[in-house]
Amino acid sequence: MVVMNRIRVSKRVEKKLAKGLVLLEASDLENVNLKDQEVEVQGQEGNFLGTAYLSQQNKGLGWFVSKDKVVFNQAFFETLFRKAKEKRSAYYQDDLTTAFRLFNQEGDGFGGLTVDLYGDYAVFSWYNSYVYQIRKVISEAFRQVFPEVLGAYEKIRFKGLDYESAHVYGQEAPDFFTV
């Protein structure tokens, strides 16, 4: 079992989360010195609100992910990817659609990550260092749910690494192809 640090948020942030606003901003997390990790979110009275992760990115300091106690493991991401795939089933049936977003951050249940499909190849975009840290778990879950994808690449959308894109797994895409 994973032991998570806990953060306590104000009534204002409790209301924000209850409305479904899941981006955690600096003003939401006063006096929190944690970063790049999962956290349990508690209300002002110490009541459990859900699970989030903290990691600096262009917008915000983290994401509230679930009202449940969850662990960001392969099974968790497989579930998210299955739901996302089901939502986009119409795109798979349309022969004229060969490029689309397979997974769209908080809209699919996990802010800080997008996955786009171009033909038979996926592109993961990591928007913060925490998501990048767990990229192997994410990509393995993805491979289980999307075995038809021939290969994948990654785009780094945050500062701190010495590269911006790389091949992740599978076949390499041709230099040029039509989508």
Residue ranges and their predicted role:
Residues 73-80, 130-138:
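Short amphipathic alpha-helical segments
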Residues 120:
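Divalent cation-coordinating acidic motifs and surrounding scaffolds
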